[in-house]
Amino acid sequence: MQFKNLIIALHGVGASCSALRPPIERRATTEIPSDSFNSLETYWNYLYPWGATHNGGARMDEEHVSVTDGVLTLTAEPRDDQEDPIHYLSGAIHAKSTFTVSAGGGYDISAEFIAPVARGTWPAFWLNAASGWPPEIDIAEWKGSGKISFNTFNTSDEVAALDRDYPNPGEWHSVRAELRDENGHDVRVKFFLDGVEQTTQYGRDYIGAGLRLIVNYQTEGSSGSPGPTTPTTFQVRNVEVTSLN
């Protein structure tokens, strides 16, 4: 009887500790501040996490990354001195930190963009697996169609994907993704464009999986070819990552 009472008491202590955990909104901790581009190399590395190329016609190059007044500019420059399929030098950066949604937690990730949408332009703001693949969450992707895409991959064949019209691409637009623990295993992702919710998608078994945040300007590939014959730019500002774990 005493042993049974002890088990009940310990269970009650565990429940009390769980109940005392702060609400998720009170756990907010800024991991990448909105002015991080002013201290670029404190928070970001150049290129993709794995190197200079990825599924397109551009090779990433540090010289094609610049920051002015807190605005990141990635410039895709046509080149005829590269071996196929590379037809451009362009820019990419990725966060030095790895982000992992914990049980009961989440992340808010947001930024503002002036993104090209012409054929052959393929800028993206996305999360990719730190090890293996998936996870992958395309928080914002533009694939030369005049639309913006929101995507979550569970396998290469099982993909939640939504394309939306992207009006006035020469103006600034805001994008936000809210990642939350759904059930202890899966992550729920809500996507917002200019403050308006667009869709909700789910990443299976994403809890506990490390994610790398990437900002890049790829060309051709999935965005069509040939791409632009003169330099084009992808501009980004106010990237912010808030942990709710």
Briefly describe each language-model feature range.
Residues 17-107, 113-119, 130-134, 139-144, ...:
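Low-complexity, Ser/Thr/Pro/Gly-rich disordered linker/stalk regions
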Residues 159-166, 201-203, 223-229:
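Active-site rim elements
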Residues 193-212:
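Short, solvent-exposed beta-strand-to-loop segments that form ligand-recognition rims
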Residues 37, 109, 171-182, 189-191:
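Short tryptophan-centered beta-strand motifs in secreted/extracellular beta-sheet-rich domains
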Residues 153-174:
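Short, aromatic/His-centered strand-loop micro-motif at the edge of beta-sheets
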